[in-house]
Amino acid sequence: MAVDKFNIMRESNFKYSVAIRTVGKAGDKYIQELQSLHNQTVKPEHIYVHLAHGFERPKEQVGMEEYIDTPKGLVHQRAAANMVEEEYVLIIDDDVYFPEDAVEKMYNALQKYNADGIAPDTFPSQSMSFFSKAGAYLTNTVKGRKNDEWAIRIQRSGAFSFNSNPEKGAIYPTESAAGTAVFMKTKVWKAIHYEHEVWIDKYPAGTFGEDQLMYQKIIENGFKLLMWYDSGVLHLDANTNKASQKSYDKIYYRAMSQYLTWYRCIYDLPRNTSADKLKNQLAYVYRFLLSCSVRLVYSILQFSPRFLTAHIKGNIDARKFVKSEEYISLPHFVLSPKE
């Protein structure tokens, strides 16, 4: 499924708008993003900037942006893309650079492969060092796969596996992606009702895998997602949404995220049989025990059990939460036509 840029016909008869989430602190990287959007071969109809409530409008402006005061939270600000009325929407963070023909090429890829959304590969896991890959597996069972013409696959444990050797410039189907940027059909975006997941925003920004949940909601509701390798789209990484909590709190909330994402996106799906659920549980137990062993070693080295206990307590509290009235009352992850 490798893409040849010379074999994709130019199609420019489409309209889209951009939805950016920001707290207004990306600085020069935000300017680079805006300028790259203004330089697109197909211009956006609107550039909506969903600025978190209480934060000042960035001094850096290009001129076409429309600022929308939005409740603070990664999900609240992303779900605000619902206001887009054009046929397509480009949903992005505030620190992404796009080559001038990037949006046009993403549109053309959707037509060629009959897909609903496409995300550029802005976090190339396949390029990690050996030690980084080993660490990713030990802490989170993230692992590489041979080139099977898929990009990201989600394992039963909730962790992802990545294509270790994608073809240069390839476009492959995927089950997840970095949340940095995605171009998709607006009707599909609205169909998944991402606003139903605003419960995530009660957790500190940067501790919850809300992007994985977003993409899996697209997949589990029957839509097709692509990943584009070597696109030239760059995550400039302004570091504005990293977790502020350190040590204990950070580990605790990430452990909660790990369990809740697994439960909502993997375990508690209507298509699962009893056998599927058992396999999912066993996979998660393996992931949990492996990550506990790593945190045990770290706790020993730091002469403190807190790093291990934070991970365990996060999982325990997450398990309690999915049995609570608050969680049970959430709308279904896989939506019925009436929802």
Region annotations inferred by a language model:
Residues L74, W150-M184, G206-T207:
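A recurrent flexible, glycine/aromatic-enriched loop bordering the glycosyltransferase active site
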Residues E220, K224-R306:
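Active-site-adjacent helix/loop segment of glycosyltransferases
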Residues D69-E85:
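Glycine-rich, basic loop-to-helix element that forms the pyrophosphate-binding segment
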Residues L34-D69:
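Acidic donor-binding segment of Leloir-type glycosyltransferases
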Residues D101-K146:
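Conserved donor NDP-sugar-binding/catalytic core segment of glycosyltransferases
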Residues V89:
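Short aromatic/hydrophobic "clamp" motif used to bind/position activated sugar donors
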Residues A177-G179, I200-Q216:
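Acidic donor-binding loop at a coil-to-helix junction in glycosyltransferase catalytic cores
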Residues I20-N39:
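Short, well-formed alpha-helical segments that are part of the catalytic scaffolds
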